[in-house]
Amino acid sequence: MFQDNPLLAQLKQQLHSQTPRAEGVVKGTEKGFGFLEVDAQKSYFIPPPQMKKVMHGDRIVAVIHSEKDRESAEPETLVEPFLTRFVGKVQKKDDRLAIVPDHPLLKDAIPCRAARGVEHDFKQGDWAVAEMRRHPLKGDRGFYAELTQFITFSDDHFVPWWVTLARHNLEKEAPDGVATEMLDEGLTRRDLTALDFVTIDSASTEDMDDALYVESTADGKLLLTVAIADPTAWIAEGSKLDKAAKVRAFTNYLPGFNIPMLPRELSDDLCSLRANEVRPVLACQMTLAADGTIEDNIEFFAATIESKAKLAYDDVSDWLEGRGSWQPGSDAIAQQITLLKDVCQRRSEWRQTHALVFKDRPDYRFVLGEKGEVLDIVAEPRRIANRIVEESMIAANICAARVLRDKLGFGVYNVHTGFDPANTEQLAALLKTHDVHVDPTEVLTLEGFCKLRRELDAQPTGFLDSRIRRFQSFAEISTEPGPHFGLGLEAYATWTSPIRKYGDMINHRLLKAIIKGETIARPQDDATVQMAERRRLNRMAERDVADWLYARFLNDKAGTDTRFAAEILDISRGGMRVRLVDNGAVAFIPAPFLHAVRDELVCSQENGTVQIKGEVVYKVTDVIDVTIAEVRMETRSIIARPAV
């Protein structure tokens, strides 16, 4: 009698439209209940029975109920699920499979089955890739997933690498394919095989892509020739190898091993500038004035060289610092090293004065055993030999940026615009409270940005620098020339690592067109989009593997009195993140470990400080002593506490 009643339908419609609703993201907790976070200020409680319908991270619309001054959310519709494709560990009980996602806030096993075509017989503890197939808010009875790929067994020592690469959907090995012969590019190559070119790299490096040679002139100038490996002499644009390199975009450097962008035969042999082997190169010659200025007579050309020595950073640095027993193999090599030191000093002084120089941070190197176990983590400071190579490469990239801009008007540029214009008023206000005065419009210019950076670098601590980092914009890859504020340069285009960066291969092809006097099309934007995405994924993969290895390395220190010096990275309501100075591991110190009485403790992200009873006790960039309280292997998180 009521089923077709239009009044009843209208009433239902009215009730539905009058019921308050909110859209937000579900935040799970360890305790079974959750919250619907609508924005930074507003969140609603989700009771445990309702949490069974959703997953941490789901974006949903929920009905808001009010009872006795307490509001709660009842999930109604799914806007965007948190899990689509994910990795996890398989559970097997009575031939029934389930998978626990590898995520700190997802603890529940999701029933699953192997997808069609997946041959592997899954066992307890196996790692797998899965895809969600059912969700309670889509009208399904429960969550359900399909296993689409077997990753590895639970006892595989290399789980951190294989699981991380699968999580980010990245390649596990070098690309297939061989390059049999060099292309006929119609280039005339200068024979520079008689010159004393040298390479300087880590002792273990096989993919050497840059060699250097310097001469001094009668009037006190330096002629620097930078010779770069020439993979585009072997790889034709649009070929199978080229397409594979375009997809990978970069060589993926993970702790312990790398996954190259090009087949190893090319990256580690045919293109690698090995000592005493004749190799084709793309070269740039520049003249450096006494003050380090790069003069206007920049020249790019194709050549063949024969590196006369494979030098290692530490050997060269030791020799220049008068330490250790290593000696250059000949007087000619010794002279090259001495001249290169001069190049480095001139360019470094020029950049200090006219551009910006990054503060030196050590690189952390994992020393691994046969079974992927972490034997040691070594902090490798950036020494004089590292700086020689860095200054030479930056100079060469400045040359390419100028030539591409002036001759073509495009290229693959690294662009960084400093601060987001929307943030400069806030920035100026923050700096003013610390007696640093900037004009919000001036700081948007390259000159204004450099002026501020120099002022911040002169501060006694890095505290203020860390406070303004959130106002900065990100570096981008663009086909349009533009300034790089971070380096303090008008334009910057890399071409010195074509074995490991696809963008550098593109710039090689553009520079070759200029050398030959040919016209060439502007690179497609899809290439730069892919590069930016791959750079992001590779960085996340490197961080994930490192987190896993740090947890393994520090596991036996948990609960001991071993002290570590740690720099405070940032402060949030829940506590502080710190980086251990000796090995680079990042740990979290929960707020209760800082002070037992919560009401007397204020952790302020805004100010970058921790106050106890109104007094600042800790601030970002402080270095404090900590001990390791706990290592949670399943989430690869390290919990520390201030050492007493």
UniProtKB/Swiss-Prot annotation:
SUPFAM superfamilies: Nucleic acid-binding proteins (SSF50249). It is found in: Cytoplasm. PROSITE patterns: RIBONUCLEASE_II. InterPro entries: CSD, NA-bd_OB-fold, RNase_B_OB_dom, RNase_II, RNase_II/R, RNase_II/R_CS, RNase_II/RNase_R, RNR_Ribonuclease. Residues 561-643 form the S1 motif domain. NCBIfam families: 3_prime_RNase, PRK05054.1, RNase_B. This is Exoribonuclease 2. It comes from Klebsiella pneumoniae (strain 342).
